[in-house]
Amino acid sequence: MEWDKDRIRNFCIIAHIDHGKSTLADRLLEYTGALTGREMTEQVLDQMDLERERGITIKMQAVRLNYRARDGRDYQLNLIDTPGHVDFSYEVSRSLAACEGALLVVDAAQGIEAQTLANVYLALEHNLEIIPVINKIDLPSADPERVKKEIEDVIGLDASEAVLASAKSGAGVEEILERIVTRIPPPGGQTGAPLRALIFDSHYDPYKGVVCYVRVVDGSVSNGMQIKMMATGREFEVSEVGIFKPYLASVGELRTGEVGFITAGIKNVKDSRVGDTITEAGRPAPVPLPGYRKATPMVFCGLYPVEAGEYEALKDALAKLKLNDASLTYEPETSEALGFGFRCGFLGLLHMEIIQERLEREYGLNLITTAPNVVYRVKTTAGETIEIENPSKLPPPGKIEFIEEPFVRAVIMAPKDYIGPVMELCQERRGVFTNMEYISVNRVMLNYALPLSEIIYDFFDQLKSRTKGYASLDYELDGYRQSDLVKLDVLIAGEVLDALSVIVHRDKAYQRGRHLVEKLRGLIPRHLFEIPIQAAVGNRIIARETVKAIRKDVLAKCYGGDVTRKRKLLEKQKAGKKRMKQVGRVEIPQEAFMAVLSVGDK
């Protein structure tokens, strides 16, 4: 197909989890003949094993489709698939920056969910043309008219012309493609201007080096060209230029408006940053593209190798993962209990789980993870403000004037029958009610201000179980507020274990400490001496459990005889245990560190 900028359409699909986004992408690929029947598997664009197992999209993927429209002209459509989960909204915002339009996919039975709303607002910020698609119309419980009304009332988009489709059966797919061609504008940009290409993603290939996924905004890029990264100033020679079919396929050149990939023998991971602008070394562009706002990590945890010798391997793996996931942050730290490791920042709990699983699977590492926590702000008596990412770094209580914790604005959508349980859960988690509105006759939208630290444990699971899976949640950071917080330490055999320290609200400290020591008692194996497990706030012990010692029966050989003989043996054993207690080391299994996670409000 001849290149013509006016016949290029760059679009993405936005939807809540499970509204059929990846299946719709499959149908579009199939309809336009991008893949043969043999290559077609379900959820083609979810290429990671993890994505298939969990049934969610984690990484955005790009693919080029060629489509002959009803007007008889050939169009080049670049689809950029996006994730739907709240933790990956950064991936979504990056793919939106590379598009001119978006398909808004809404489940005909479920209606609008919290996540859909958040992504639509992102798309509107980027001035994208939005095409509503009501999916799963073949479900018995589908109610397209109600969903159309919801789209108009809640989002304010005209849904009278929404496409009714079923990604499963393929109904409505041609209509969607026609809408993309007629409604989404062609890309802007100047063909003759110096090259400007936006890196919207990248991954590391052991043979080719860094593979940059780019959207060419101005000019063109071809094999052999000398390019320059505008943020770092480094120069490279392009070795391969290509497109996504969705597998990588070489072409000689990428022109204005096209989406594809570039390799240039970039060996150092830091040289190609996502959001950077690529330009021609000999004829550089005067200003870079706006790029992206930096992702702010919300949740932090420590990652430590089980074997101390794997530290370098972990460092290397994190550097390569960061290339593929720009929202991950990490810095080295040491723990008295766990040795050398990294303090990592994530966008949320699911993001943390995924990164941990990817490190273990893709890089074969064995890891210990400490309990996740948020960033607290501490105003000291000396008048300075410090940010605390690690609970063990909290200053002593005497030096603290007050502590602030991050709050979020949470939007919860649920059927009206579940208003009670949802409000009860939010109150338990120290939530502050802001307002409530009915979206339709049966569905309600609740707005709450909640402490982020209360959300990151099991809030989402609890919300789902109390509403039988019908509620959906979306949240965004809403500044810091002052709270009455204390540090809860865990002492094992009299020693503070820094990796188990957590920062909790004073009202919940006793309950949390009680749960924690009970849980640890079941997880720490018995030793030859007894082990006290204590939870403490400051110098005050608030809960204690004891792991009893394993005792050898020293009286087995004594048959009858004098009681003093037996007492002598028992005293001797007691003295030995006492000595052992002073020098003995307590073995703490990995489960003990994870116990802190699962100590919810039971």
UniProtKB/Swiss-Prot annotation:
Entry GO MF terms: GTP binding; GTPase activity; ribosome binding; translation elongation factor activity
Keyword check for Protein biosynthesis: yes
Listed GO CC annotations: plasma membrane
Cystine connections: none
EC assignment: 3.6.5.n1
PANTHER family in UniProt: TRANSLATION FACTOR GUF1 HOMOLOG, CHLOROPLASTIC (PTHR43512:SF4), TRANSLATION FACTOR GUF1-RELATED (PTHR43512)
Name of the protein: Elongation factor 4
Species, as recorded: Pelotomaculum thermopropionicum (strain DSM 13744 / JCM 10971 / SI)
Phylogenetic lineage: Bacteria, Bacillati, Bacillota, Clostridia, Eubacteriales
